[in-house]
Amino acid sequence: MSSLGYNILYNLINERQDTWCERIVYPHTNSIESNNPMKNFDIISFSLQFEEDYFNVLKMIKQSGIPLKRKDRSENDPLIIAGGPCATANPMPLSDYIDVFVIGEGEVTINKFLDIYLENKNLDNFLDMDGIYIPEFNNNAKIALINDMKNAYHITQPIITKTDKEDYKTVFSDSIMLNVSRGCTRGCRFCMSSYLYRPLRETTIKELVNIALKTRENTNLNKITLIGAAVGDYYDLEGLTKALESEGFQIATPSLRIDSLSRETLETLKKSGLKSITIAPESISTLRERINKSISDEKIFSVIKNAVDLDFNIKLYFLIGIPYESKEDIEELANYIEKIANMHKNRNYIKFSINPVIPKPQTPLQWEVYNFKEIKSKTRYLKKKLRKYNVKFESPKKGLIQYILSCGNREVGAVIEKSLTEEVTLKEWQSYLPNYNINDELPWSKIDIGIKSNFLKTENRRLKTKKQTPWCGDSPCYNCGPCN
C-alpha cells in the first residue's frame, strides 16, 4: 500500500467516470472501501514489488474462490492482471496464473487498457499496446514508460486510511510522497532498478515545491518522503532540501547515495527533522569495483563521521556472495564493518544489514548463479565474527528461494502453487535452480525493457575484470538502448 505506483493507479482509475477502484490487502480478500469480496470485481490487479509477493498472490486468488489457474477461469471470473518491477523484469513464474502483465509504468497504459476492456474484453484486443504481456499468446512486449516527468502523474491528494488495523497502516501514511525522479543510470551491476526504468527522468525543484505545497493544503501533512530510485543523484539535492526546508517541511528519504551526502546536505536534513539515514556501501572497495559502485573508502568514512557528529542513527547495507568474492574478501569485510561500528561510542546507533546478492533478470548478473553452500558458510563466519555488533542477516535459504523466483521460468509456478498446501523441501527448491549460459535464450526474452543484450553481456565481462563503467550522467552515452 506504500507503493507510489499503487497510489498513482488508485487515483487515476477513480478520476474516471466509468471506473471505480478499491483496495484489498493481504491476508484479506474483501475490499477496504466496501468490504466487497474479491471475486465480485471485474478486474483484480496485483502490484508485485518483491518476489515473495508471489506466494500471497496465489493465496489470495485461491482463498477468494476464483479458479487459481487462468486456463480454468471463465468469462464470469475477474480478469487478473499484475504489474510492478517483478512483473516487468520476469513475468514467467506466475504466467500460468495471471491473465495480463503490465510491463513498465502502469500510468502510461491504464487508461487505454480500461477503454479497450470496457469496449471488448477479449484479450487479443490488448496485443497492439506497448507495456502488455499476455501469457496465453506469449507475445513480445515492449516496456511502457513516461518520457518526461512533466507528463508524470504527481499525487496531490494521497490516500489516507484512518484505521487502527495494523494490516492497513502504510510506511508513508503520515507523509507526502514526493516523486523526485524515476530511473537510475548509475549501473550498479546487481541492481534491477539500475536497468529496468532507464533513462533517468527528474522533476524540477519548482514543480516539486508546488506539488508539496498543494498536497499540504489538501491534507495538512507536513512531512515529505523523497521517492525515487536515484534521489541521491538529483541534479540539485541540496537546493531541493533547502527549498523544502524553507517552506517548513520535514524531509525524509528511504535511502541516499553516499557520494551525494555532503556535510551541508546532512545538516539541512537534520535541521528539517530527519533522525536516521540509510546508506549502502555494499562491500569492500575491490568488490565494489566488480559491481560498478566506485565510491572510495575515504568518502564512506567521511559521510559516516559527519552523520555520527550530527547525531544521526545510521543503517548500512552490505552484500555477500558477489561473484568472484573470496574467503579473504569476507574476512576483510568483517574487519571493515567492525571499524565502522566502532566509529560511534554507542554501538546501538549504527546498525548493519547483510544480505546475499540475488542475481536478477534484466541485469548483468542474470547469468550468474546463487551459490547456496558458499553463502551459508560466509553467513555463519560473519555471524560469529560480528556477534557483538548490531547486525541482521538475511537467511541464505530465503535468498535461494528469491533467486529461483527472480530468474525462474514458467515451471517455477508449480512449486509456488505446491507451497500453498504443503512444505516444499530445500532439495525440491534446489531442483528449480536456474543455470544459464551467456548465449542462452532466457525465460524473459519476450520482455523488451529497452536495454541491449550486448550491453548487459559487456557489463558481465567487466564484472569479471573489475572494469568500471562510469555513470552516463558524467560520461559520453554508452548506447545501452533506452535513450534511443
Each model region followed by its residue ranges:
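N-terminal [4Fe-4S]-dependent radical SAM core
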Residues: 135-177, 452-465
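Conserved SAM/AdoMet-binding glycine-rich loop
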Residues: 43, 52, 210-315, 319-349
